[in-house]
Swiss-Prot record:
Function: Transfers the 4'-phosphopantetheine moiety from coenzyme A to a Ser of acyl-carrier-protein.
Catalytic activity: apo-[ACP] + CoA = holo-[ACP] + adenosine 3',5'-bisphosphate + H(+)
Annotated gene: acpS
GO molecular function: holo-[acyl-carrier-protein] synthase activity; magnesium ion binding
GO biological process: fatty acid biosynthetic process; lysine biosynthetic process via aminoadipic acid
Taxon lineage: Bacteria, Bacillati, Bacillota, Bacilli, Lactobacillales
Disulfide feature: none
Protein name: Holo-[acyl-carrier-protein] synthase
Record-listed Mg(2+) binding positions: D8, E57
Pfam families: ACPS
Organism of provenance: Limosilactobacillus reuteri (Lactobacillus reuteri)
Subcellular location: Cytoplasm
GO annotation, cellular component aspect: cytosol
Length: 117
């Protein structure tokens, strides 16, 4: 049974204009995600950061709490399987979290569906 659906669209250029990207990265990405970001550069790094931010926004909408007191960016971790498919590997929901990420040059859109009993 579907518990919740969340969708988000984010402008990638917004991340290029960050005044303190290190602080923002530490707030949004887990240690494992930060290590993966370190291996990327240029446009691909911005797409990665925007994509992970957007997934976490979508997840918070599907979960029904938004980001804040009950759920923060560090509670959600995105990884990729052997085929490059995004997977939400760490999250508070007891069921399954399905995720889709798509981006163009300037935007990323994500959708999260939470499924449980």
């Amino acid at each position: 049974m579907i518990y919740g659906i969340g969708i988000d669209i984010t402008n990638i250029d917004r991340f290029k204009a960050l005044h303190n990207p290190t602080s923002f990265i530490k707030k949004v990405l887990t240690d494992k995600e930060q290590a993966e970001l370190a291996g990327k550069s240029g446009q691909r790094a911005y797409e990665f950061l925007a994509g992970h931010f957007s997934v976490k926004e979508s997840y918070s909408k599907a979960y029904g709490t938004g980001l804040g007191k009950k759920l923060n960016f560090q509670d959600i971790e995105v990884e990729y399987d052997d085929n490059g498919r995004p997977v939400i590997s760490n999250h508070p929901f007891a069921g399954v979290a399905h995720v889709s990420i798509s981006h163009s040059k300037h935007h990323v859109v994500t959708q999260v569906i939470l499924e449980g009993d």
